Amino acid sequence: MKLIFAGTPEFAAAALRELIAAGHEIALVLTQPDRPAGRGMKLKPSPVKEVALAHGLRVEQPEKLRGNQEAQQMLRDIQADVMVVAAYGLILPQDVLDIPARGCLNIHASLLPRWRGAAPIQRAILAGDDETGITIMQMDVGLDTGDMLSIHPVAIAADETAATLHDKLAACGAQAIVETLGRLDRIVPRKQPEDGVTYAQKLSKAEAEVDWALPAEQVARAIRAYNPAPGAFTQLGGEPLKLWMASAEPGSAEPGAVVSADADGVLVGAGQGLVRVSVLQAAGGKRLAARDFVAGKSLPAGTRLGV
């Protein structure tokens, strides 16, 4: 099948690799323009661009598609069967959605209609969902409102972080799009249910600051959901302290008060229950397992976090 592929981060790169391996003709790859990154803020290509160039594929990086007649004509000239879209980062107007013979298919990281929007992976963990997955969707101009072509459930583990769930879903999405394209002629699209719609709004750095007055389970989920970005944090002696891994335990203590700090973790009071933080990062330092963190920094019982 002759494809245009549009995507930017590693989530999309996994799908591109799988489509190439499956033998599809990738006539064009669209991805976001190179962005400054790293300490030197040098321009860095997206993961999708790196994969595309490694396989000798044509890459284009328009700043926008809406109203961009030159880019739209370029897409028409390809005469693609399908455009596959995965975390591209640009809005596709109707005149672009109509260009491929069979439209545009999106790889969305949730079981729609739950978690439409920008941050479905993190929002699923924050909400305490047991399951999420991949939806392959026929795109329309709405926010993840198109007809569903296939759904692929993925379990959320008790200790899941956004990083680990991302990798599971990227692998699932890559397999799902190949499978769906392979039986596209036999699929009857299904409307999304009207019940159960939720929206996964974009994450903000402000919401990643830990509120120790919340129940321990909610705090622990937030710490895992914000790993790797934007990174949950609290205050320790006026300095930011990042928290990367945590679980909830029974018990009680003042919210934000350290109960104990040893090789098994830093145990902190919450609004209901205790939070055991097992991976931490002091300002200017590296991520450390609790064992190594407490070996270099004293956290006596009663130390207050968040102040």
Curated annotation (Swiss-Prot):
Spans traversing the lipid bilayer: none
Tree of life domain: Bacteria
Cited PROSITE patterns: GART
Binding site for (6S)-5,6,7,8-tetrahydrofolate: S110, L111, L112, P113
Class of this enzyme: transferase
Gene3D superfamilies per record: 3.40.50.12230
GO cellular component: cytosol
Catalytic activity line of the entry: L-methionyl-tRNA(fMet) + (6R)-10-formyltetrahydrofolate = N-formyl-L-methionyl-tRNA(fMet) + (6S)-5,6,7,8-tetrahydrofolate + H(+)
Keyword tags: Protein biosynthesis, Transferase
Pfam family, one: Formyl_trans_N
One function term, GO molecular function aspect: methionyl-tRNA formyltransferase activity
Database matches in PANTHER family: METHIONYL-TRNA FORMYLTRANSFERASE, METHIONYL-TRNA FORMYLTRANSFERASE, MITOCHONDRIAL
Function: Attaches a formyl group to the free amino group of methionyl-tRNA(fMet). The formyl group appears to play a dual role in the initiator identity of N-formylmethionyl-tRNA by promoting its recognition by IF2 and preventing the misappropriation of this tRNA by the elongation apparatus.
Protein's recorded name: Methionyl-tRNA formyltransferase
Species this protein is from: Chromobacterium violaceum (strain ATCC 12472 / DSM 30191 / JCM 1249 / CCUG 213 / NBRC 12614 / NCIMB 9131 / NCTC 9757 / MK)
